[in-house]
Amino acid sequence: MKLIELCVLCAIAFAAPRQKRLTVGTIAVTGGVGGASGCVVTGNVLYANGFRLRELSASEQQELTNYEKQVAEYKASVKQILKERQEKLKSRMSGKKEEKAAVTSTKDEDLPKPPQKPSFCTEDDTTQFYFDGCMVQGNKVYVGNTFARDLDQNEIEELKEFEKKQTVYQEYVQKQIQQQVSNLFGGADFFSSFFGDAKDQTTTTVAPVLPEDAPEQPAVPNFCTRIY
């Protein structure tokens, strides 16, 4: 039973949308997952990554109630599917013969979709920008866990532009790394020498298409100054 429950939690974690995560030097941009990270509601008060945001409105409380019901139904469905898979696996291991139709495993894409997050919990609410000396979340500057100030309108626009350019830059860097690793190990031909006859392999590795002009790493916003 514990194994099934663990599988349910893993399925939920992998099915859920991935949080944004960027890094640049001493800066980390992350949506945060697990524990007090992300959105948490207790006593009708909304928290994001451990920081109190506000009280939920009446309509948002109803939205939360509906979400809790959908999550319960989703967990029950995933648990039932995993239980059926476990029973089929036990039957195979015990040597029982079953018809092909009976032993056909459920594909991952056939798993139920997790419920959509409530409208009051968005990526803008949970994304954190860690700079050298401070952190920005929800257009608010924090020093440690202490609220310092709100970003002004110009700083908000600067942060949006930085995030946009940094995303493009990191995607380019990621492709460069993939290409270098592929060239280093010779693509599929390298691994085929271990798992088959290399001379019979016809698969070739196509290098990722990279932009002719590499994007520049964006300048880091100066929202705080660390004194060394």
Curated annotation (Swiss-Prot):
A cellular component annotation (GO) from this entry: extracellular region
Superkingdom classification of source: Eukaryota
UniProt similarity note: Belongs to the protease inhibitor I33 family.
Subcellular location: Secreted
Source species of the chain: Trichostrongylus colubriformis (Black scour worm)
Entry keyword Signal: yes
Disordered: region residues: 88-119
Keyword hit for Hydrolase: no
Endpoints of the signal sequence: 1-15
Protein name according to UniProt: Aspartyl protease inhibitor
Alphabetized UniProt keyword annotations: Allergen, Aspartic protease inhibitor, Disulfide bond, Protease inhibitor, Secreted, Signal
Pfam families: Pepsin-I3 (PF06394)
Disulfide bonds: C134-C224
Role summary: Aspartyl protease inhibitor.
Biased composition (Basic and acidic residues): 88-112
